[in-house]
From Swiss-Prot:
Region annotation Disordered: where it falls in the sequence: 1-27
Function: Binds directly to 16S ribosomal RNA.
GO terms of molecular function: small ribosomal subunit rRNA binding; structural constituent of ribosome
One of the protein's GO biological processes: translation
Keyword Chloroplast: no
SUPFAM superfamilies: Ribosomal protein S20
Organism: Leifsonia xyli subsp. xyli (strain CTCB07)
Cited PANTHER family: 30S RIBOSOMAL PROTEIN S20, SMALL RIBOSOMAL SUBUNIT PROTEIN BS20C
Designated name of the protein: Small ribosomal subunit protein bS20
Membership in a protein family: Belongs to the bacterial ribosomal protein bS20 family.
Feature: compositional bias, Basic and acidic residues: 16-27
Length: 86
């Protein structure tokens, strides 16, 4: 346990950020999974709308600093490639 006042506050803010980042990453995984499932079923309409949502969430996570912008770009291109193959 930290004794310094500033470190106690940092621990508190780090915990909040960790919970927020965990929630965002969970949403990302769900959105990407939904896109991949739509691709697996062969539903082009559903896949393209899921891709749009996943891309939006990836961009938002990258802008907030939850994931790196290059990682967001790589994930977007990977799922876009799968949707385009339909």
């Amino acid at each position: 346990m930290a004794n310094i006042k500033s470190q106690i506050k940092r621990n508190r803010t780090n915990k909040k950020a960790q919970e927020r980042n965990k929630a965002v990453k969970s949403e990302l995984k769900t959105a990407i999974r939904a896109t991949r499932e739509a691709v697996a079923t062969g539903d082009k309409e559903k896949a393209s709308s899921a891709l749009r949502l996943a891309s939006k969430k990836l961009d938002k996570a990258a802008s907030k600093g939850v994931i790196h912008k290059n990682q967001a770009a790589n994930r977007k291109s990977a799922i876009a490639k799968q949707v385009a193959a339909l």
